[in-house]
C-alpha cells in the first residue's frame, strides 16, 4: 500500500509554474494523501529567487485559508518553507516561526559577488566565472566550500527535510567543474553526508535535475543514498 505525497513543492508565489489551488486539485486527482508546499523563504539578499516578506505573507495567508477549510477527498495541506543555508538570522527566525516544516537547502556560494549572488543552480556563466576567478578554476575547491556551507547550516537549523543534497552537480559536467566519478569528489561528498547526518532531517530524493534535462540521476547520487541508509537514515 502506498501513500502518495510530496513535500518539496513550489508554486507561483516563488519560482513554480502553477497556482496553489490548481496544484492541490492535481494532487487530489493523483490520489495524494498530503501535499506540502515549500516556497523559497526570504533569505535577505536575493528577491529574484525567494519570496520577499510581503509575498511570503501572502503565501502563508493563502495556505492557511485552505488549511482552515479542508474539502473532503482533498489531500491534507502543509505550509512549509525551503530555507537557504545563507539566509540571514532574522529570516531564519521568521521561517522557523511561520512554517509547518522546513526544507534545508544550499543554493548559494556567496550572497554578493560584484553585486550579484552566485548560486550553484543559477546563472551558469556567472558560476563558471566565479569558480575561475575565486577558485582559479578548481571545481573541487568550490565543492569543498559548498558542502561546508550546507553542512554547517543543516547542523545549525536542523530542518525536517534535507533538500537536494548535492545540487552542485547540476552544472558539473556541462561547465567541466568536476568529475562526479573522481574519487576525490566522491570522498568529499560522502564526508559531507556523514557530517550532516546528526542534523536528524529526512534526506529527500529530488528528481528536479532530471525533469529539467540537466541530469540523468536524482539528487543525491545512489552512492550517497546507500551511504545514508547504512548510517541509519
Please report, for each region that a protein language model flagged, where it lies by residue.
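Extended substrate/RNA-proximal surfaces in nucleic-acid metabolism proteins
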Residues: 56-198
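Short acidic/histidine-rich active-site segments
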Residues: 40, 165, 231-233
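An N-terminally biased module of ancient metal coordination in phosphate/nucleic-acid-related enzymes
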Residues: 1-85, 94-96, 100, 169-184, ...
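Short, well-ordered secondary-structure micro-motifs
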Residues: 47, 90, 215-216
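Active-site-adjacent C-terminal substructures of enzyme catalytic domains
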Residues: 183-233
Amino acid at each position: 500500500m502506498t501513500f502518495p505525497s510530496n513535500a518539496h513543492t513550489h508554486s507561483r508565489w516563488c519560482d513554480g509554474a502553477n497556482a496553489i489551488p490548481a496544484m492541490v486539485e492535481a494532487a487530489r486527482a493523483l490520489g495524494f494523501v498530503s501535499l506540502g508546499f515549500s516556497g523559497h523563504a526570504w533569505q535577505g539578499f536575493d528577491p529574484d529567487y525567494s519570496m520577499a516578506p510581503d509575498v511570503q505573507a501572502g503565501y502563508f495567508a493563502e495556505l492557511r485559508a485552505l488549511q482552515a477549510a479542508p474539502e473532503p477527498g482533498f489531500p491534507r495541506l502543509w505550509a512549509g518553507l525551503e530555507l537557504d543555508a545563507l539566509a540571514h538570522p532574522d529570516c531564519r527566525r521568521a521561517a522557523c516561526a511561520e512554517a509547518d516544516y522546513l526544507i534545508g537547502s544550499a543554493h548559494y556560494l556567496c550572497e554578493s559577488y560584484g553585486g550579484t549572488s552566485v548560486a550553484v543552480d543559477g546563472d551558469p556563466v556567472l558560476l563558471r566565472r566565479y569558480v575561475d576567478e575565486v577558485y582559479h578554476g578548481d571545481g573541487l575547491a568550490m565543492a569543498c566550500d559548498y558542502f561546508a556551507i550546507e553542512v554547517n547550516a543543516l547542523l545549525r537549523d536542523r530542518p525536517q527535510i534535507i533538500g537536494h543534497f548535492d545540487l552542485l552537480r547540476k552544472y558539473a559536467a556541462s561547465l567541466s567543474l568536476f568529475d562526479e566519478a573522481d574519487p576525490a569528489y566522491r570522498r568529499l561528498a560522502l564526508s559531507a553526508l556523514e557530517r550532516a547526518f546528526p542534523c536528524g532531517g529526512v534526506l529527500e530524493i529530488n528528481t528536479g535535475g532530471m525533469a529539467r534535462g540537466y541530469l540523468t540521476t536524482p539528487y543525491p547520487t545512489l552512492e550517497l543514498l546507500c551511504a545514508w541508509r547504512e548510517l541509519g537514515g
